[in-house]
């Protein structure tokens, strides 16, 4: 119910069609792989998830309580910048987008890794930003079992992801399913 109410705030404000395609799903589901196939096939630009030059991501996995809020603000800001850049393009693809960011923040708040006050600041900022960008033309949700995603995470070999307990990935998967059951912004 939370996510349904969240989306209702933006349905009326986002009426223009755009050519933004977003791919979302849990960590390790294959968003980047699918994105590369789509961009190669259709010759469109792709915005990668900002994980390579992210100064907070590895720290977050070792100290979630300390780094959850600044990490979520970092991602929110980068994804907002990408959405603004996307307005200048005829079409583009996003490997994860500003729209799914709330999943992580909501989960962190529910798990007491982010304070309620931090979450409220985050949510208010997100709502302000979403009023300034167009909704995606298409949202692709890649659904996966936790065991399949974890196998891909192991194969990828990012040390900070390998340290994460299975319960975190299971919770993330449940939050994604709830989010996309309520998602109704794209055409």
Regions found by a protein language model. Give the residues of each.
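P-loop (Walker A) phosphate-binding loop of NTP-binding proteins
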Residues: 26
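Conserved substrate/cofactor phosphate-moiety recognition/catalytic segment
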Residues: 36, 40-78
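A glycine- and Lys/Arg-enriched "phosphate-lid" helix/loop adjacent to the NTP-binding pocket
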Residues: 104-175
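Conserved nucleotide-binding/hydrolysis micro-motifs of P-loop NTPases
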Residues: 51-53, 98-100, 144-149
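Hydrophobic anchor at the beta1->P-loop junction of P-loop NTPases
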Residues: 23
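Extreme N-terminal, non-catalytic leader segments
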Residues: 1-19
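Conserved lysine of the Walker
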Residues: 31
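Glycine-rich phosphate-binding loop used to anchor ATP phosphates in small-molecule kinases
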Residues: 67-134
């Amino acid at each position: 119910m939370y996510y349904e109410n969240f989306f209702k705030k933006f349905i009326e404000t986002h009426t223009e069609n755009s050519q933004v395609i977003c791919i979302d799903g849990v960590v390790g589901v294959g968003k980047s792989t699918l994105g590369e196939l789509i961009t190669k096939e259709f010759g469109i630009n792709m915005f990668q998830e900002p994980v390579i030059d992210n100064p907070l991501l590895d720290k977050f996995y070792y100290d979630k309580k300390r780094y959850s809020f600044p990490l979520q603000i970092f991602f929110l800001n980068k994804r907002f910048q990408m959405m603004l850049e996307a307005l200048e393009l005829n079409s583009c693809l996003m490997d994860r987008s500003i729209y799914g960011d709330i999943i992580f923040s909501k989960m962190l708040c529910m798990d007491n890794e982010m304070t309620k006050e931090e979450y409220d600041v985050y949510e208010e900022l997100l709502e302000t930003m979403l009023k300034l960008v167009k909704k995606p033309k298409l949202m692709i949700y890649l659904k996966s079992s936790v065991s399949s995603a974890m196998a891909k995470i192991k194969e990828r070999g990012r040390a900070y992801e390998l340290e994460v307990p299975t319960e975190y990935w299971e919770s993330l998967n449940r939050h994604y399913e709830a989010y996309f059951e309520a998602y109704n912004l794209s055409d």
